[in-house]
C-alpha cells in the first residue's frame, strides 16, 4: 500500500523547507575559497587517501565540508525527526519531574553495571521482564531520570518510543542512552501497565552499506562499527535505515519513497523553481475578474512544478485561484482574495503558509456552492 498523498505532500513540504533554509544560510561569502593554511598543511598528507589532486581541489573540499557539516546538523536536529512524526503520526515528548519506585531504580542500576562489566549481555526480553517485576514490588518512590523520546506514539495496546541518533554517535554515550531507555520503559510500564512498551534506538541510514544500495543495511556490521554499542544494546531494540522508516510508516520501501521525493525536488534548478511557485506568478493582477486574469503559459509551468514536487493540495489551491480570478466576487471577498493571492507559500522564515491555501479553498467552496 503506497503512502497517502497527504503524507507525501508533508514530506515534500519539509524537504522544501530544509532546502530553502540551507540556501538562506549560505551566502556568496560562505562559498568563496578561503585561506586555511593550517588545514591545508595537514590535509596534504591525505591527498592520495581521499583522491584529491592539488591544493585548488583541497580548498574546495574544505569549503564544501563546512557547508556539509551545517546540512548534517539540520538533518539530524530537525528533518529526520519531523519526517518520523509525519510517517507515524507521533510527536516528540519529554518526561521530567516524575517518580519511580526505588526497586526500579536499583534494578536499572544493576542492569547497567552488569552490562558495563560484561557480566551480562544485552537481552531486551529479559530486561523488560526484570523491569516489570521491579515495578510490581512494594517500594518507596524516588525521582526518575528525565528523558525525551524523539518519537512517541501510542495505540490501544502499545506505547512506542524511539531515540533517533546520528549514524556516528559519540563514543561513550551508549551507556547513558541505555540508562535513559530503561528509565523510559520502566515509567511507561508502571503508568500504562496494560500496554506493551517499546523503546527503540533508531538510525536513519547505514553508513557501512554500499552507496549503490542506499536503503540497505547490515545491523550486525553497523553495530560492531560503533564503540561499545553491542555491549549495551540488543539488536532487537535497534532500527536502522529501511527498517526504521518502514516501521514508522507501516509501509514497505518507505526509505526509497522518501529519497524519491527528495530527489524530485533537490535539483540544481531548485531555487529558480521555488522563487517561481512561492507566489502566484500566473495572475495578471491588473486584469483580475476578467477573461485575461490568467497567464495560461505561466499557469501550466506553475502546475508542472507542483506536480513534480508532489504538492497535491497546492494544485487544488492553484485551480481555485484560477477560477476565483475569473468570477464576480463581492467587494468584501475581493479584498480577502486579493490579500491572500499576495501571500507567499513559504514565509521569510521558511514556514509553510497553510492558512493561505485553506482560506482560498474556503472562499472557492463558498462560490461553487452558489
Curated annotation (Swiss-Prot):
Keyword DNA-binding: yes
Catalytic reaction list: Endonucleolytic cleavage of DNA to give specific double-stranded fragments with terminal 5'-phosphates
Family statement: Belongs to the TdeIII type II restriction endonuclease family.
Keywords linked to the UniProt accession: DNA-binding, Endonuclease, Hydrolase, Nuclease, Restriction system
Enzyme Commission number(s) of this protein: 3.1.21.4
MF terms in GO: DNA binding; type II site-specific deoxyribonuclease activity
Sequence intervals crossing the membrane: none
Organismal lineage: Archaea, Methanobacteriati, Methanobacteriota, Methanomada group, Methanococci
Gene Ontology terms: biological process: DNA restriction-modification system
Protein name stated in the entry: Type II restriction enzyme MjaII
Function: A P subtype restriction enzyme that recognizes the double-stranded sequence 5'-GGNCC-3'; the cleavage site is unknown.
Record bears the keyword Lipoprotein: no
